[in-house]
Amino acid sequence: MTDAQIENKFKLAVDYITNNSGKLSNIKNEEQLYLYCNYKQATIGDCNTKAPPFYDYIGKSKWNSWNSLKGVEKIVAMNSYISLVNALSPGWDSNIKVERATQSVFLNDEEFKELEKKEKEEKEELKKLEEENGGEIEKPKSKWMGPVLSKFSLVDDETLEKLEKNTKQDLGYWVSVNDIERVKKEIENDKNIINEVDEDGRTALIWACDRGYFEIAKLLIENGSNVNVQDGEGMTPLHYAVVCDQFEICKLLLSQSSIDKSIKDNSDSIPSDFIDSSTSENIKSLFK
C-alpha cells in the first residue's frame, strides 16, 4: 500500500476500535497500551509532554508506552496500529475499500491546541451540570482506545484546581507556578516556611522536583530544604526526580552530602526501584 492508503486504513482502524470497544473488552492491558502509544505516535509524533507523577499509575504507563516510540516514523506507527487491529479482529476490514486518504489524520500544533481547548470546555460544562444536578448526572462512557488527545499534567486536575483556588498562595503555590522571584521573597520573609508541608505532605522542594524546576530546587536546597523529607506516600524528592525523569535535579540531589538514597516509600521502594526502560540513560548512570 502507498503511504496515503496506509494513512486512510489507519483512520478506519481507529474508527473501528473506537466504535467496537464493547466487543473488544477482553483486550489485554499491554495491547491497549500498544494501540494507545502507536495512535499518539502516528498522529502527533514523539512524546511532547512531561512524565506524570508517581501516583498517576495509569498516566505513567501511558506516558512510558508513548515515550518508548521516540523516533519512530508516523507511517510506521500507523502500520503497527493496523497490524494489531488485524490480529485482534481478523477480517475487520473485509468490506472496506482502502482508498487514497481525503483528509490527513496528522495533527499540527494548531489542531492539537484546538482539541485540548474543546476537551477542557466539555469537562467544565460537565462539571457545571453535575453541580446543578447535585452530582446526579450520567457521565459519558470512556473509549480511551480511540483518539484520546489530552496532554498529561505532572499534577492531577483536582490538585491543580485546588492550587487555582488557593487564596493563601503559600511557598508551595509559588513553586508550582514557577515564580522564582516570589519564592525568593517568601523565603526572605520567613525561612521557617521552607520545610512546611501541604495536605499531602509535599514540601516546596518536592513540588520543584515533581515539576522539574531546577533553579527553584537549587534555591530551596541552598536555603535549608530537607532533601530527605517524605510526603504522605513516603516519597522523597529523589523519588519524584527519578519517576519524573528529571536528570539535572537527580544530579543536584545526589550531590548533597546528606542525601539518603536508601529511603523507602510506603510501598517499600527506594528511588532507584522506579528506574525502568523509559528512564533516560543519564539518570540510569547516576545509580550505577
Curated annotation (Swiss-Prot):
PROSITE patterns: ACB_2, ANK_REP_REGION, ANK_REPEAT. It is found in: Cytoplasm. GO terms for molecular function: fatty-acyl-CoA binding. GO terms for cellular component: cytoplasm. Its main location: cytoplasm. Keywords: ANK repeat, Cytoplasm, Lipid-binding, Repeat. The keyword Cytoplasm applies. Binds long-chain acyl-coenzyme A molecules with a strong preference for unsaturated C18:1-CoA. Does not bind fatty acids. Plays a role in protein N-myristoylation. This is Acyl-CoA-binding domain-containing protein 6 homolog. It comes from Dictyostelium discoideum (Social amoeba). The lineage of its organism: Eukaryota, Amoebozoa, Evosea, Eumycetozoa, Dictyostelia.
